[in-house]
Amino acid sequence: MNNAKIWTVVKPSTGIPLILGAVAVAALIVHAGLLTNTTWFANYWNGNPMATVVAVAPAQ
């Protein structure tokens, strides 16, 4: 572990929960952002099928 000296400054009983908490908060922020800014993500979580895209052939 190349950052082993961090535990001389911060006790592992404090640092590990802080790190895990920060990861959890970051994940919640990312998922909340996806849910509020996209229409497909909520549908994906609800198990709805994806909308079909129909390709139109170019006119000649």
From Swiss-Prot:
Periplasmic side, ranges: 36-60
Where are the Cytoplasmic topological domains? 1-14
Location relative to the cell: Cell inner membrane
Q: A single Gene Ontology molecular function, please? A: bacteriochlorophyll binding
GO biological-process terms attached to the record: photosynthesis, light reaction
| Topology relative to the membrane | Single-pass type II membrane protein
Q: What is this protein called?
A: Light-harvesting protein B-800/850 alpha chain
Q: Which organism is it from?
A: Rhodobacter capsulatus
